[in-house]
Regions:
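Structural detector for short beta-strands of small beta-barrel domains
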Residues: 376-397
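Soluble catalytic regions of membrane-associated enzymes that act on cell-envelope
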Residues: 15-198, 274, 339-343, 347-353
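Structural motif
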Residues: 90, 263-270, 331-336
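Long, repeat-rich segments with strong aromatic
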Residues: 244-294, 298
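OB-fold (S1/OB) nucleic-acid-binding surfaces
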Residues: 397-413
Length: 428
């Protein structure tokens, strides 16, 4: 704990610099066909299912739980290595190494198994001298490391990015990242880079948890140590939870910022580049993430779907929470968009295109965008079939009908206010 005014000033200034930003100008507007639809849990399900389809691997290997989110050739993906099923399987296969890694496209949900000419020999799940943490300890005995991140370069070569920790305030305080050791997962070749010199294809140098800790210091001691205890003028902290946003060739961590007095609203949020730690604060008063999740769940309350932690998007220059809605089995059934500033603006859809279309129409209805910007995406598909289930709910005074067709697992949502001519047929 920090116990002096001088120490608090050092923590505020030395660890993290936060600039103000313009969300609409700096965060590129994203189209429905570019929205990452997979959270880590869904990616894990797809990865395990894919491995189960490979007869030559499923009996010997398992999918490791890394699922690092990176930008790969301009696409947001999650990558993860394999691991040995048990000790016996390790003994039988260790000479060849792990034969492949998985790449999960977060937009298309395609899973690629990338087979390697030479197997991966250095991982966090290895044993003895090839265990990555032990390997680093012998190669760099004086370094302290944070948790390594599995990444691939633009040629698909697997690496471990191992951030080097340094203490910048006294002997034990002011944790920061001095640089990173890049370990070739196949050959074990190591290269150290200072933080400013890390190759641009690397996405994870500064862990999200460290950035959050540093911002909390920054927000707590913004007006000094005494103010952090008494008065607490302008004191802010991060909200619970965070997610990632792809901007350009980099991955940014974002989290909400709220006042130190616990409430259910944000005063804004930060975006922090996980390669450079460049951090910007965006003033957008609105709902905090869990309130937005509850709003989305309220739209489909009769389905009892659970919302994933939201992704922050720019839709029509509006900061927007996007999330998947899952059933009790963890399967994605619908998608939701919630306006950050006005979280009563909630739209859902059975696919992302429908969800965005409904959301844009609601923005136009609230006069946040022009009608010309509320067009339905060109390739939105019509659904036809025999109704197998109809459910109703009244939300905000508006009757909503949830329709399911025979042979499908998703529900289509129709508002009585928006389509009375269609709903009249339902009562025939």
């Amino acid at each position: 704990p920090i116990k002096s005014s001088a120490a608090s000033d050092v923590y505020k200034r030395q660890l993290l610099t936060v600039d103000n930003g313009d969300f609409a100008a700096e965060v590129e507007e994203i189209s429905y066909d570019q929205i990452p639809m997979l959270d880590k849990d869904s990616a894990e399900k797809l990865g395990n299912r894919k491995l189960g389809e490979l007869a030559d691997m499923v009996s010997q290997f398992e999918v490791a739980g890394d699922y690092t989110q990176i930008n790969y050739k301009g696409r947001p993906v999650r990558v993860t290595p394999l691991r040995y099923g048990d000790w016996i399987k390790w003994l039988n296969n260790r000479s060849q190494g792990l034969p492949a890694y998985l790449v999960i496209d977060m937009v298309t949900q395609n899973v690629d198994v990338v087979r390697l000419d030479q197997g991966i020999r250095y991982t966090t799940a290895e044993h003895f001298g090839r265990n990555l943490n032990r390997y680093l300890r012998f190669r760099y005995p004086t370094y302290l490391f944070d948790a390594p991140a599995f990444e691939i370069d633009e040629d698909g070569n697997p690496f471990w990015v191992c951030p080097r920790i340094r203490k910048t305030i006294g002997l034990f305080g002011g944790t920061d990242i001095a640089g990173a050791v890049l370990v070739n997962a196949v050959t074990g070749e190591c290269t150290y880079y200072d933080a400013a010199d890390v190759p641009s294809w690397i996405d994870h140098v500064y862990p999200a948890e460290l950035i959050i800790q540093q911002y909390d210091y920054h927000g707590t001691y913004v007006n000094g140590f005494i103010n952090s205890l008494f008065g607490q003028r302008d004191v802010t902290v991060t909200t619970d939870g965070y997610n990632y946003l792809a901007i350009g060739d980099d991955v940014y961590m974002y989290t909400g910022i709220t006042s130190v007095v616990s409430d259910e609203s944000n005063i804004g949020f930060i975006l922090s580049n996980q390669r450079t730690k460049e951090t910007r604060f965006y003033t957008v008063a609105g709902a905090e993430e869990y309130s937005a999740m509850e709003s989305a769940q309220g739209q489909v309350q009769q389905m009892k779907y659970a919302a994933t932690f939201p992704l922050l998007l720019n839709i029509a220059d509006q900061p927007t929470y996007f999330m998947a809605l899952k059933d009790a089995a963890g399967l994605v059934k619908m998608y939701a968009m919630v306006n950050v500033s006005q979280y009563q603006i909630v739209a859902t859809g059975s696919d992302v295109a429908e969800c965005e279309s409904n959301y844009r129409q609601m923005l136009a209805r609230y006069n946040l965008i022009d009608d010309s910007d509320a067009n339905i995406p060109a390739d939105t598909q019509e659904a036809a079939g025999v109704l197998s289930d109809i459910r109703t709910a009244v939300i905000g005074g508006d009757s909503r009908y949830y329709l399911r067709l025979q042979g499908e697992s998703v529900y289509y949502v129709i508002s009585a206010a928006d389509a009375p001519q269609v709903l009249s047929l339902i009562h025939i």
